């Protein structure tokens, strides 16, 4: 470790101890050397004894800075790793930091635009940022070419070395978790950090975010439900993104929405429909739909439209995952726990040798109490969470795409019920899911699949006789090759057997000659001839092994 890394690690450990986070480590895991090390090098009392553990963890991460704040935000979505009181506190982490100097942002923009001054491309560039976060900040301007208002997102200068340095330390600490926590190995801390690293590095590439926004905008083009601002890709680079400036009401400002005359019931239901449309129709969903990234258009409050920004994190599901997920939801709400268990096994989410009866009983035990509530009060997100937590006891592998989906669903539910507390997600989603499943199976789906594949098979039809002939000929050659290899293996086996036999005889003659030479000198040349014969036989055997 470099001196800088040692200093940073020392600061991190002292921060954790000042918030009493060593409480997370069972006393029995702290050996005497570790205790001596802790009190000699890191003597630091808990200065926040009046606060609960979850709050202390949140405050410690906030003190450690942006990389740790985002790590805590990511951990808040992994409710399979933490008890609810800790996960809820981590969800409160705010990714708000002081803005960096606007002149540095201006210099980065000029560098991205080939060294030309900002005035060559933009009018009314505001040196004061509109918003600032740990990874990037946003400035406003107008395009010189058409006068349209835009926002310019710029990555913080020199943020990559800071991220890489802290990630190295997070990896080091993650490797200690299995040694210090009883359940540490099951938590797979290194995999969790690797998942976080991928998400964070992806956020540093604004070309990726630009592509995501363009895709989402195309998916919802002319939709009354969701609007994604236009991206001006000619101006975008890895460190800079330019997109249309939008004006809307923050979705969390319920009072302003009501004052504008917004149809709150329709708005809440559209949030659910937008989510399921992204997941099941498009297989491409905005995975960071927290209230700070969602606005509502001022126009047509009786027919409200969402506006989505910050498309840095997206998720996708393949066709099989979508089908299993939809069938899981329907089976769960029909209380068909056997079907839920079988779907988990069929999908490969749990090992194929899982005892389905035991799995069904575990799901029933955990999930049946949920139905004591009215359907309108049941949380889809918590349904998924309960299923994942139960499945993890049966060695369910972490499914990153499903973790993202569950996090997004919790956001959608939270926003929907904040807007309209009586929102019945099941009533809104069930027709969509049943319609989608019906569209994927049966005669219409088979007919559609055949139509899609027909041009391919028509194109390949003339080649089929030749392909069959080539396959038969290759099969014949393959059989010859197999026979040849089998003969060679048999010859080698015989040769190896002969070699071992000769090596054994040679070694026996050599040892016998040596014994007689020492103990029976009166035998004359006989021991010598035995030794020479042994060497010759041994060499012949050795050559057969070559």
From Swiss-Prot:
Q: Classify the protein's membrane topology as the record does.
A: Multi-pass membrane protein
Domain of life the protein comes from: Bacteria
Q: What is this protein called?
A: Probable protein kinase UbiB
The record's Pfam families line, in alphabetical order, gives: ABC1
What keywords were assigned to this record?
ATP-binding, Cell inner membrane, Cell membrane, Kinase, Membrane, Nucleotide-binding, Transferase, Transmembrane, Transmembrane helix, Ubiquinone biosynthesis
Which GO biological-process labels does this protein carry? regulation of ubiquinone biosynthetic process; ubiquinone biosynthetic process
Name one molecular function that GO assigns to this entry. protein kinase activity
Q: Where are the transmembrane segments?
A: 501-521, 522-542
* Residue positions binding ATP: 130-138, 153
Family listed: Belongs to the ABC1 family. UbiB subfamily.
A GO cellular component annotated for this chain's UniProt record is: plasma membrane
**EC annotation?**
2.7.-.-
* Active site annotation, chain numbering: 288 (proton acceptor)
* Chief location bin: membrane
Task: Give the UniProt subcellular location, in the record's own words.
Answer: Cell inner membrane
Cite the Protein kinase domain residue spans from the record: 124-502
Name the pathway it acts in.
Cofactor biosynthesis; ubiquinone biosynthesis [regulation]
Function recorded in the entry: Is probably a protein kinase regulator of UbiI activity which is involved in aerobic coenzyme Q (ubiquinone) biosynthesis.
């Amino acid at each position: 470790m470099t001196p800088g890394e040692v200093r940073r690690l020392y600061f991190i450990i002292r921060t954790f101890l000042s918030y009493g986070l060593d409480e997370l480590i069972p006393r029995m895991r702290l050996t005497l050397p570790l205790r001596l090390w802790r009190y000699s090098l890191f003597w630091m009392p808990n200065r926040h004894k009046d606060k609960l553990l979850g709050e202390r963890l949140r405050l410690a991460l906030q003190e450690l800075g942006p990389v740790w704040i985002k790590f805590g935000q990511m951990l808040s979505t992994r409710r399979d790793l933490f008890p609810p009181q800790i996960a809820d506190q981590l969800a409160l982490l705010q990714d708000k930091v002081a803005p960096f100097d606007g002149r540095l942002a201006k210099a980065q923009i000029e560098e991205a635009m080939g060294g030309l001054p900002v005035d060559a491309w933009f009018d009314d560039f505001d040196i004061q940022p509109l918003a600032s976060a740990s990874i990037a900040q946003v400035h406003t301007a107008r395009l010189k070419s058409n006068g349209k208002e835009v926002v310019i997102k710029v990555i913080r200068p020199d943020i990559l070395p800071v991220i890489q340095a802290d990630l190295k330390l997070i990896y080091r600490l993650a490797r200690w978790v299995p040694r210090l926590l009883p359940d540490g190995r099951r938590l797979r801390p290194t995999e969790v950090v690797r998942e976080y690293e991928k998400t964070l590095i992806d956020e540093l590439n604004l070309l990726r975010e630009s592509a995501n926004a363009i895709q989402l905008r195309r998916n919802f083009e002319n939709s009354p439900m969701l609007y994604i601002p236009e991206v001006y890709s000619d101006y975008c680079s890895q460190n800079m993104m330019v997109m249309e400036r939008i004006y809307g009401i923050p979705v969390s400002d319920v009072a302003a929405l009501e004052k504008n005359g917004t149809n709150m019931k329709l708005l809440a239901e559209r949030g659910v429909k937008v989510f399921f449309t992204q997941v099941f129709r498009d297989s491409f969903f905005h995975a960071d739909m927290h209230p700070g990234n969602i606005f509502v258009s001022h126009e047509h409050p009786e027919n409200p439209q969402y506006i989505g920004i910050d498309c840095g994190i997206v998720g996708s599901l393949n066709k099989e995952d979508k089908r299993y997920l939809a069938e899981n939801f329907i089976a769960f709400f029909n209380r068909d726990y056997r079907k839920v268990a079988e779907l988990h096994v069929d999908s490969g989410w749990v090992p194929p040798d899982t005892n389905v009866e035991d799995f069904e009983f575990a799901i029933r035990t955990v999930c049946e109490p949920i139905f004591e509530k009215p359907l309108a009060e049941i949380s889809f997100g918590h349904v998924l969470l309960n299923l994942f937590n139960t499945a993890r006891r049966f060695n369910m592998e972490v499914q990153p795409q499903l973790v993202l989906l569950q996090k997004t669903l919790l956001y959608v539910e939270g926003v929907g019920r904040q807007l309209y507390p009586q929102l019945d997600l099941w009533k809104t989603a069930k027709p969509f899911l049943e319609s989608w499943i019906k569209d994927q199976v049966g005669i219409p789906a088979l007919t559609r699949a055949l139509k899609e594949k027909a041009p391919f098979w028509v194109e390949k039809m003339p080649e089929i006789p030749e392909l069959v002939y080539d396959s038969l000929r290759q099969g014949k050659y393959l059989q010859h090759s197999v026979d040849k290899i089998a003969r060679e293996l048999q010859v080698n086996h015989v040769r190896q057997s002969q070699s071992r036999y000769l090596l054994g005889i040679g070694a026996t003659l050599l040892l016998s000659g040596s014994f007689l030479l020492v103990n029976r000198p009166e035998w004359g040349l006989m021991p010598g001839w035995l030794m020479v014969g042994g060497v010759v036989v041994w060499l012949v055997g050795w050559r057969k092994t070559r």
